[in-house]
UniProtKB/Swiss-Prot annotation:
The modification Phosphoserine is found at S360. It comes from Rattus norvegicus (Rat). Interacts with GGN. It is found in: Cytoplasmic vesicle. GO terms for biological process: cell differentiation; labyrinthine layer blood vessel development; labyrinthine layer development; negative regulation of cell population proliferation; negative regulation of gene expression; negative regulation of receptor signaling pathway via STAT; spermatogenesis. One of its GO terms (cellular component) is nucleus. May be involved in spermatogenesis. This is Gametogenetin-binding protein 2. PANTHER family: GAMETOGENETIN-BINDING PROTEIN 2 (PTHR13601:SF2). The keyword RNA-binding does not apply.
Amino acid sequence: MARLVAVCRDGEEEFPFERRQIPLYIDDTLTMVMEFPDNVLNLDGHQNNGAQLKQFIQRHSMLKQQDLSIAMVVTSREVLSALSQLVPCVGCRRSVERLFSQLVESGNPALEPLTVGPKGVLSLTRSCMTDAKKLYTLFYVHGSKLNDMIDAIPKSKKNKRCQLHSLDTHKPKPLGGCWMDVWELMSQECRDEVVLIDSSCLLETLETYLRKHRFCTDCKNKVLRAYNILIGELDCSKEKGYCAALYEGLRCCPHERHIHVCCETDFIAHLLGRAEPEFAGGRRERHAKTIDIAQEEVLTCLGIHLYERLHRIWQKLRAEEQTWQMLFYLGVDALRKSFEMTVEKVQGISRLEQLCEEFSEEERVRELKQEKKRQKRKNRRKNKCVCDSPASLHTADEKAVSQEKETDFMENSCKACGSTEDGNTCVEVIVTNENTSCTCPSSGNLLGSPKIKKGMSPHCNGSDCGYSSSMEGSETGSREGSDVACTEGICNHDEHGEDPCVHHCEDKEDDGDSCVECWANSEENNTKGKNKKKKKKSKMLKCDEHIQKLGSCITDPGNRETSGNTMHTVFHRDKTKDAHPESCCSTEKGGQPLPWFEHRKNVPQFTEPTEMSFGPDSGKGAKSLVELLDESECTSDEEIFISQDEIQSFMANNQSFYSNREQYRQHLKEKFNKYCRLNDHKRPVCSGWLTTAGAN
């Protein structure tokens, strides 16, 4: 803590202030000299961090002498700007500004090693500027105490003032150790000056005391007479009841009107002890009937006056010490920032720019990653969904012709199938390569064939397709009348004496009739197996199923059989391999294409290319109906032949088919219905077909 080392008797302008000494104004009659010891700013005795000190020395050596001199100069604006930002107490800010102005005017080395120039410029001494170790200790050891010192100052919650600048501090408080603390920090010269009491000031304190305690007129006169004896205006020998021992240690100067009090600590403590009940509080009526009691009242007022003076000195000392520390640490912090900015300019890039560059680099890396992800998703969407080029607009006449062709196509397709059902019934022509009749399964794709029973013929022309639409309690169809069994050649029609080829389509090549008996059986069996849920399905949804089935089976004029019988190729869906159709059938009778083949040639003239997906789980690209029809022509001349051994091996490996058959059928129905719903609004051709066809 700072000490009081001297008294400015002739005025502070003429006093020779040394390093770290500032004047301390007490009142109009007293100004002391306040000094900060050297151990407060010991720049040589600290143990510094070796790595940080080495780095600082390296940075210090980077600067030339001229650059270092420029870096170690800051203006008053920078210091006061930091003051307004860091210090909340308005009293502290005003005190710092006042002290800085005093140092600018006087030029005293009060902040050494900091110096204050006449133009308000704050700098460092040459010895500290050139010594890297001292500079490091000043910047990073003492300079780091600024925030801690500001945070440690108690502040009022009401107005953010510190205790030293609040109004409550000016009121005297009960005696404590504060007077002893300030008494110990005073030099002998300061103590002698403190105990030198002005008689007029003591009289003012005495009158206040008499009014406070309501002394009567006689008692008040007794006290005033005792005061006059103390200052030497009355002869004490003439006063009856006067006690000279009470005024022991007190000496008056009548010419200068001073009262000299003994500066011994014990005597001062005795006087302050008399005044302690007064500071404890409470007003009471007091009397002084005799002169000795009046003397004691005068000593009490002397103790009050002395305590108030010591309390004022203690308050001024602490406030000025806090002000000096704030100004010193603010100057050190401003110089440190100036030094670091100069070093960064020499290096060519600041730490802030480095940080911004790091953030920019991270942002660029993040953008590259996101761009790669977007490109991957874009490529994945391109591979999954191949978009067709937009078709040109058609006139109203072309649309009318297209609708007529669609109607003709539906009529021809029904004739080719030989169906005798009404317009609400939708069937699909599925033709086999076994020279047998065609069948009309309701699901659109044939599942694997069941296991062959004993006594059954490998060839059959039944037409119930093994399909049961009932969702609960219905038995699955047998091989008797199953189109799968007929297709694979494992039905038992031969056991009943029927010719395996009795239903071949050789009646009329010009007709579209094929296997009328199979159609009739299929219609009868399918009608019996329908449940209520199947009947409630909308006609439009069933027509969508029919359109999907019609698009999967087309005629191919390039494939012909020498026997003249109709050749059929069926879509096969293997539940263990692929869930997508891979081939399409082509049908031709006696060298003359079926009616829907002629219609297929006309389809590209009026169909609009749209996006199409085979199903939600399809991994292939979407293809239009025209592309599917074109691909159907690319069947090879050599048809895939499945031997009887392969069929039996397949049946043996899939014994659990019957138990899961209803699940497979339901799964296929849901997928097909979903496809129809997704593509109903996209294809005008399909919509045209659906309006002319029904569904089972």
